[in-house]
Amino acid sequence: MEGMITRRRFVQASSAAAALALAGTGGCGMKGSDRAVKIVVVGGGAAGLGVSARLVRLLKKAQITLIDPADRQFYQPGFTLIGSGVYRPDQVWRRQSACIPKGVKWVKQAVTALEPAKNTVTVAGGTVYPYDFLVLTPGIQCNWDAVEGLSQKTLGEGNVHSIYDFEGAQKTWRAVQAFVEKGGRGVFADTYTKHK
């Protein structure tokens, strides 16, 4: 299909932030290890996937567990392209299971407790995962309710839209199409400092 992002390209693009972060700290020159350690990575977004992929390549005997409840992995920069009609919604996501690096155990649960003194992570089902090293890449959650007059439920209804999430980007494109058809005056705003 023309315009589709391949799985390989998708994972490469969504892992760019993690790769840049590692490069900035000398990560590209890191040497591998034969130590048998347990590593838990909390968060399966671009950073969590990128770090997990890097660790599984460098640490041949490590047990790497990635914890994230999401079914889908989103290429979030693509949300702007959905909102402008360049991409279709199906072009910015993949099944999370297809993005987990080979050799990494995926736990599809939400984290409910971190106990650094005990080196453990507890998930929603009650299972406790011990670790030698913990990597936290949980991502963010937009707090729309902190903006007077907005809520996650009402955003995208009426004339206020955002491309900061998957559903919002689709609503934005529908609103742009309606605006082009009807005409009128459009007001676009951006925050002084990014909230994501």
Sequence positions of predicted segments:
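N-terminal secretory signal peptides and thylakoid transit peptides that target proteins
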Residues: 1-18
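Glycine-rich, N-terminal phosphate-binding loop of Rossmann-like dinucleotide-binding domains
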Residues: 14, 125, 138-139
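Active-site beta-alpha loop architecture of Rossmann-like, nucleotide-cofactor-dependent enzymes
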Residues: 17, 141-142
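C-terminal segment of classical bacterial N-terminal signal peptides
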Residues: 23-26
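Rossmann-like dinucleotide/flavin-binding elements
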Residues: 29-61, 146, 152-196
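Conserved Rossmann-like nucleotide-cofactor binding loop
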Residues: 47, 72, 141
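N-terminal Rossmann-like dinucleotide/flavin-binding domain of flavoprotein oxidoreductases
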Residues: 57-131
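Short hydrophobic core segments
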Residues: 130-139
